[in-house]
């Protein structure tokens, strides 16, 4: 039997309703969790694109969030629709300033583990997670670069996506 789904209410979105200036970019911290470390799959609040705050009780004993300090101005979250009634694709880009054996080790884990991501956006946090679909890094989207000249920056650049999701952004 087909499930009836209610469309979200359409409302005014005005910049004067936001108590912040509309600057691009995100905070320098990216928090990562492994989906299998959750005590139970996360569920958005009924009819909304928000999750309850994660606490220690959200995770199995001894598990939790990993914090990555990233390059200032290197993080971005974009989303796009996948067509009528096909949901959205979310993309997360972030840049680590550490290029060494530890960052290569972590990059391998991120490439192969099923993870969720939390990114600071002003006084809110964007949550890139879906209990049914996995965040993926396509070929070539995790790159380490030591640079060639002394003035070059040493970075690990990561760009992955999650699709389909019901909304383009979850908080």
Where are these regions (language model features)?
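Short, acidic/charged, Gly/Pro-enriched secondary-structure junctions
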Residues: 105-131
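Solvent-exposed edge beta-strands and adjacent loop segments
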Residues: 3, 8, 12-93, 135-150
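Generic "edge-of-domain/loop-turn" microfeature
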Residues: 38-39, 99-101, 124-126, 165-167
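Short acidic DE-rich linear segments
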Residues: 1-3, 170-171
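Oligomerization/assembly interface segments of phage tail-like spikes and tubes
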Residues: 79-101, 151-166
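Hydrophobic side chains in beta-strands
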Residues: 32, 96, 119-121, 162
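Mixed-charge, glycine-accented linear interaction segment located at domain edges/termini
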Residues: 131-171
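Short, conserved charged micro-motifs
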Residues: 101-108, 169-170
């Amino acid at each position: 039997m087909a499930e009836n789904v209610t469309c979200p209410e359409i409302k005014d979105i005005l910049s004067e309703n936001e108590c912040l200036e509309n600057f691009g970019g995100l905070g320098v911290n990216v928090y990562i969790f492994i989906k299998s470390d959750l005590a139970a799959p996360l569920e958005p609040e009924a009819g909304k694109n928000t999750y309850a705050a994660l606490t220690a009780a959200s995770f199995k004993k001894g598990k939790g969030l990993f914090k990555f300090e990233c390059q200032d101005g290197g993080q971005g979250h974009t989303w796009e629709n996948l067509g009528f009634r096909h949901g959205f694709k979310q993309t997360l880009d972030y840049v680590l300033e550490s290029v060494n054996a530890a960052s290569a080790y972590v990059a391998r884990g991120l490439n192969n583990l099923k993870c969720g991501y939390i990114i600071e956006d002003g006084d809110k946090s964007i949550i890139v997670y879906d209990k049914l679909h996995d965040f993926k890094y396509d070929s070539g989207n995790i790159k380490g670069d030591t640079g060639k000249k002394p003035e070059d920056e040493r970075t690990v650049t990561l760009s992955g996506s999650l699709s389909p999701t019901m909304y383009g952004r979850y908080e």
